[in-house]
Regions:
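Conserved Rossmann-fold NAD(P)-dependent oxidoreductase catalytic core, especially the SDR/UDP-sugar
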Residues: 87-90, 94-147
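Non-catalytic terminal and boundary segments that flank Rossmann-like NAD(P)-dependent oxidoreductase
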Residues: 1-18
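Adenine-nucleotide cofactor-binding loop residues
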Residues: 51, 73, 95
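Conserved glycine-rich Rossmann-like NAD(P)H-binding loop of the short-chain dehydrogenase/reductase
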Residues: 40-52
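Conserved Rossmann-fold cofactor-binding substructure of NAD(P)-dependent oxidoreductases
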Residues: 66-87
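Conserved small/polar residues in nucleotide/adenosyl-binding loops
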Residues: 149-151
Length: 151
């Protein structure tokens, strides 16, 4: 296995504008904290949770952060949020199995159609890099949630 230095990875973000869908979730926040240690130009956080955005902005207090209220199911909103972005991390998803079991169509709208919207917005804006954060549970789906992330 080839070993890649941390500085080489960090250099990928130098002077870049990064957008994170689901940026106020656990993975989004961890990614934001890591990116703030680089020379990233700006980080845009796209999420539906206004309270988490306010808490995150207050706790991190970094001028490179920009917060966008939005939903991956809203393609026109993605088109606006993705303007001027170099790199996208797609971490937005419904992830709690019982919620999706009782609300399968919402799961489809967010996890499947929302992901397609992210791809469409990336293509529309010629985003140079798009990274989808997934889970190992998608390999052998056993329920509605796992079937949705398997697609």
């Amino acid at each position: 296995m080839t070993k890649i230095s941390k500085s080489k990875i960090d250099n990928q973000f130098t002077n870049k504008t990064v957008l994170i869908t689901g940026g106020t979730g656990s993975l989004g926040q961890a990614l934001t904290n890591r990116l703030l240690k680089t020379k990233v130009k700006a980080i845009r956080i796209l999420s539906r949770n206004e309270n988490k955005q306010v808490e995150m902005a207050s706790s991190l207090n970094d001028d490179r952060l920009r917060f966008f209220i939005g939903d991956v199911r809203d393609l026109p909103r993605l088109y606006r949020a993705f303007q001027g972005v170099d790199i996208v991390f797609h971490a937005a998803a419904l992830k709690h199995v019982p919620v999706i079991e009782y609300n399968p169509f919402e799961g489809i709208k967010t996890n499947v159609m929302g992901s397609q919207n992210v791809i469409d917005a990336c293509l529309y804006h010629n985003i140079s890099k798009a990274i989808c954060i997934g889970t190992d549970k998608a390999v052998s789906p056993l329920n509605t949630y796992l079937s949705l992330i398997h697609i």
